[in-house]
Amino acid sequence: MAEKHIVTVNGSDMEVWVARPEGAGPFPALILAIHAPANVGIENDPFTLDLLDRYAAQGYVCAAPFIFHWWPKEEPMDTKRAGLRDDRLVKDMNAAFALLDGMDVVDGDRIGILGHCMGGRIAWLAACHNDRLKALVVLYGGRIKAGSGEGGPAPIDLAANIPCPVLGLFGNDDQNPSPADVDDYEAALTAAGIDYTFHRYDGTNHAFQDFSRPERYNAASSDDAWEKIRVFLARHLTPGG
């Protein structure tokens, strides 16, 4: 079960929810960049809580920073989205990394990052600003070709800074990112010489792993993606994986 930690980012207290495996460790770790529905509070989002527990059960200390700490949780999502800035998001992700890196149960040389939806974009962005990350997983991350606020260039334009292998998982019925967007992601990673693997699922829309959204959830695609994520993370974050 995840526990709440508090770190301070630019004078603002940010919740970081952390789930850990049983035992003494040290364990590999993951930063989970949250999806948009978690803006009401990680404790109120069943999908994010499930992810934290799922990865802890697989042997990872998993930390989800609450990137919307600048606003009251009851503030409308449109207000929060309009105020997000990439430079702040990078600081939030780096604060979560520092929290994990400072834990005795974490092997600081085996930390990865992943995210769904807007979290996929944030994970890509964060990887471009942290050369200690060892794995990046992007699940249907949209708007990677656009900046956020006045906080810097679009994540796609920073692809050459990604320090680690990348796994991407996308639905071919999604429009954000669309298949054409995913083509552009691939082109940017190829041009930058990044080690990446993308999988695309036919008959699959955005948010296909989110069981709390039955209109989008696709069990077959989700199950296949879980297995691909498991293998990828084991290969890059687990000795002998």
Model feature map: region roles:
Residues L32-P37, C117, G141, G171:
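Glycine-rich His-Gly loop
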Residues I162, G168-F170:
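Short beta-strand/loop motif that positions the catalytic acidic residue
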Residues F66, L114-H116, V137-Y140, L169, ...:
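Alpha/beta-hydrolase-fold catalytic nucleophile elbow
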Residues H5-V105, F208-D210:
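Serine-hydrolase catalytic machinery in alpha/beta-hydrolase-like enzymes
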Residues V40-G41, W71-E74, R143-G149, N176:
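A short beta-to-alpha transition loop/helix N-cap that caps and shapes the active-site region
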Residues Q175-D181:
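Conserved alpha/beta-hydrolase "acid-adjacent" motif
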Residues T190-G241:
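C-terminal catalytic histidine-bearing segment of alpha/beta-hydrolase fold enzymes
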Residues A95-N161:
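Primarily recognizes the serine-hydrolase "nucleophile elbow" in alpha/beta-hydrolase
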